[in-house]
Curated annotation (Swiss-Prot):
Keywords noted in UniProt: Cell outer membrane, Lipoprotein, Membrane, Palmitate, Plasmid, Signal
Annotated function: The Vlp and Vsp proteins are antigenically distinct proteins, only one vlp or vsp gene is transcriptionally active at any one time. Switching between these genes is a mechanism of host immune response evasion.
Protein name: Variable large protein 9
Primary residence: membrane
Family per record: Belongs to the variable large protein (Vlp) family. Beta subfamily.
Any Gene Ontology CC annotation: cell outer membrane
InterPro entries listed in its UniProt record: Borrelia_lipo
Database matches in PROSITE patterns: PROKAR_LIPOPROTEIN
Signal peptide segment: 1-18
Sites of S-diacylglycerol cysteine lipidation: 19
Topology term for the membrane: Lipid-anchor
Amino acid sequence: MRKRISAIIMTLFMVLASCSNQLEAEKLAAESKNTFFDSLVKIGQGFQDIFGIFGNAIGDALGFNAVKSDDKRSKVGEHFEGVGEGLKDTKIKLDELLKEVTAAPHADTTEVKSVINNAGAVLTKLIDSVAKLAGATKSEAPIGDAGTAQAAAATPADIADVNTVIEGVKKIIEVAEKSGVKIEKGTAGAQVANANGPKVLTNNAQADANSGPALAAEVDKADPWAMIDKIKMLKLLLHLLHLRLMMTPGQLATGSANAANNGTAATNADLAAAVALKAITKGGKFTQPAANEDGAVKVAAASAVNKVLGILDAIIRKAVNLELGKIKEAVKGIKYSEITGEATESGIDQPITNKSSN
């Protein structure tokens, strides 16, 4: 009888112990899930902060209205600096998000960290390119600087600065294309005769009447995507030899007045891109305008510059948004795992919303 009672007591003890262990395990599991969800909330908030900072930064530096006709070229440098600061702030927030993801318990964050690191590398390359562009566009000369002396000839833009701009544009496009951005070629337009605009960039004497308004009209109808494509396709300018009658943007911007006199632009986009290159780098001056046409030349210069800046901003915005979109999808795939630390991406999907757009 005593043995039976002892057995019953032992059985009850084991049952109670088992129940206690099960309750403790369930409690720990619940706490683990709560910790996991808390971490996801922090990650989601950090992700939203990134979108907010980036959107505000690029929105404040919208390139299509960056400069006015009476601005100095340093205004372009300030624009690039503003874009660069926005990218840097975004990179800082991205690094903070990486720390949150790394610290998240009960989740495998390997894929997410890889995507964040890739996005960080893209931002770093864009920051570097924008910084170089800012350094090459710091001249205190006016955007539409032109000769004022009697029959003043055009003067060439600084080759080193033009090369820096070419390299910067090429690098931004290269990075963006790797991120998945489609770079449009645009419509380049027809060849432009010397009297319809190129004379203002290259002539060795005062420009003829109506050449200033003609240049402004050509720039106004230029396709900004085609302008960027023309700059992208330029080779670095090592010298000024072998100038052709139908000139590229680089030749129109950096050619001497004597060598480039009477030259024509290969296309409308070549002409407009040349105006932008000459208007943002140091050294370059437009030909002395005809009487009362200096305003038209300044308008042409500002319009060309804004078109280039606007498309570059659009490309940068698309590249970063695509990278952030990749992070969003990776974060959505983080799922709960019973294993502490980095485990598997299986269990509970966590949706994250944002207001991004390409």
